[in-house]
Regions:
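Sec/Tat signal peptide C-region and signal peptidase I cleavage site
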Residues: 17-23
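Active-site catalytic motif of lipid deacylating hydrolases and related acyltransferases
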Residues: 23-81, 132
Length: 249
């Protein structure tokens, strides 16, 4: 009887051990949104990746300063159990480039995003190859917002007006301090990097996107979309993120 019990315990332990060994690695994705188009724009990408088995976190950034945004992005990354893929859009690309995380981050995905080198500012990059849009406006509090009358044509021309009206009303301004702060770290030098060029982007010039991604040696995918590519082409964006994750996780 004792031998039978011992054998049963050993068998159960063996099964549990095998199950533990076969468990898949954690598949965590942290999204770092850009300015003007808020984090809710990533809803469909989030849902698509969740259905693929990924754990997805969308950080809510204040865009008050580079340090403020970095702190929130780092918190979101270090709250994950296991390795992480980080996705940045617009100014979110500059934020994630500066997040020093050691080995926890396994790859970076830039989605119509800024990709500064150490010492470069986001404003400097945008000014080097200006986009076709003309809607960025200053306010009296030291922030930049996007003119609601230009929002549809410049940021989301491939979306219906009713969707864009809400996006414009819920936009997140970006501080002049953030735009003018030099990057002190460029994580893309150390990590596998992927870039999405939104070929109809009027905020971040597609030629600037191509130039930054080429400089970084990124694997590039071009999508015919506006700057709001994550809203108009969510499946295509999710596919690039999924491929990046599966290549390193």
């Amino acid at each position: 009887m004792k031998r039978a019990i011992a054998a049963a315990i050993a068998l159960a332990a063996g099964i549990a051990g095998s199950a533990h060994a076969a468990a898949p690695a954690a598949k965590n994705i942290v999204i770092v949104p850009g300015a003007f188009i808020d984090a809710s724009s990533w809803r469909v990408v989030h849902d698509t990746l969740r259905l693929k088995g990924f754990n997805v976190t969308v950080a809510q950034l204040p865009h008050t300063s580079l340090d403020d945004d970095i702190a929130i992005a780092r918190k979101a990354i270090f709250q994950q159990f296991g390795n992480v893929i980080v996705v940045g859009n617009g100014i979110g690309g500059a934020v994630m480039s500066n997040v020093a995380t050691g080995d926890k981050v396994k790859a970076l995905v830039y989605v119509a995003a800024l990709m500064p080198e150490v010492g470069e500012t986001s404003q400097q990059l945008l000014s080097s190859m200006p986009g076709a849009g003309e809607g960025v406006k200053p306010d009296r509090a030291g922030f930049q917002f996007y003119d609601t009358a230009r929002f549809h044509a410049d940021l989301a021309a491939d979306l219906t007006p009713n969707r864009v009206n809400f996006m414009a009303a819920s936009q997140v301004p970006v501080s002049n301090v953030l735009m003018g702060t030099p990057s002190w770290f460029a994580m893309w030098h150390q990590k596998p990097t992927f870039g999405i060029v939104a070929t109809q982007d009027r905020l971040v010039n597609p030629e600037l996107q191509r130039w930054m991604y080429k400089r970084a040696g990124a694997k590039v995918t071009e999508i015919a979309a506006s700057h709001a590519v994550q809203v108009s082409q969510p499946e295509a964006v999710a596919k690039v993120i999924e491929d990046a994750a599966l290549s390193v996780l």
